[in-house]
Design a protein with these regions (language model features):
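Conserved subregion of the PPM/PP2C metallophosphatase catalytic domain
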Residues: 1-38, 44-50, 61-212
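Short Gly/aromatic-enriched secondary-structure transition segments
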Residues: 54-55
């Protein structure tokens, strides 16, 4: 269980391609004023060059996490011009407004899962726009969604097979959900990474993200 001052409880599961020493799929959870930034970077291909590109992307995100999401993607793009590039999805969760704004370049899947007041399961999917951060950016578009307590956010690289979205239980613990997705849907031909985060609502002025 997350601590009482946690606004976001998250967990990750991942693996490099067999035979590789490191993965090109990396993540970041970064504190921002009034919330958190959650990102997954998938370096093109696998191995050292993919990992190098993703490390640069995560470093660029961390250094300029205060920027608006389109500007943050552009900053990462400039930082990666001499690399093979990355696919990148980012979500900014605001505990003041109780909203999530997200953006995607490439094929890192994003899913927001909730049970509404009528008991119906709802799924919102990030719009994945064709492009490569570091090579070619598409027109950058954000989408903003209202957050509700216990909403579940899932990011997954393309090392996870399509269709994993229907295998996520809204009441699952983040670590259990991440492990299940990787185990049941991870490909043997690529790096893979899953991040699952539960929105716990606005706790207090010093709310933080907690990995569990």
């Amino acid at each position: 269980m997350a601590s009482d001052d946690s606004v976001l409880e998250y967990a990750v599961a991942g693996k490099p391609l067999r035979g590789e020493l490191e993965s090109g799929d990396l993540y970041a959870v970064i504190a921002r004023p009034h919330g958190s930034l959650v990102a997954i970077s998938d370096g093109l291909g696998h191995g050292y060059e993919a990992a190098f590109a993703s490390k640069l992307a995560i470093n660029a995100l961390t250094a300029q996490a205060h920027l608006a999401l389109p500007d943050l993607v552009k900053h990462c793009h400039q930082s990666l011009l001499r690399t093979r590039g990355v696919a990148l999805s980012i979500a900014s969760l605001d505990c003041e407004e109780e909203t999530m704004t997200w953006i995607s370049v490439g094929n890192v899947a994003g899913l927001l899962l909730r049970v509404n007041d009528a008991g119906t399961l709802e799924r919102e999917h990030i719009v994945m726009r064709s492009g490569v951060v570091g090579h070619r950016l598409p027109p950058l578009r954000i989408a903003t969604l209202r957050l509700h307590r216990d909403d579940l956010l899932v990011f997954a690289t393309d090392g996870i097979r399509e269709g994993f979205q229907t295998d996520v239980r809204p009441d699952a613990r983040p670590q259990d959900a991440a492990d299940r997705i990787l185990s049941r849907h991870g490909k043997s031909t690529d790096d893979a990474l899953v991040l699952v985060a539960r929105w716990r609502g606005r706790a207090n002025a010093n709310a933080v993200a907690t990995r569990r």
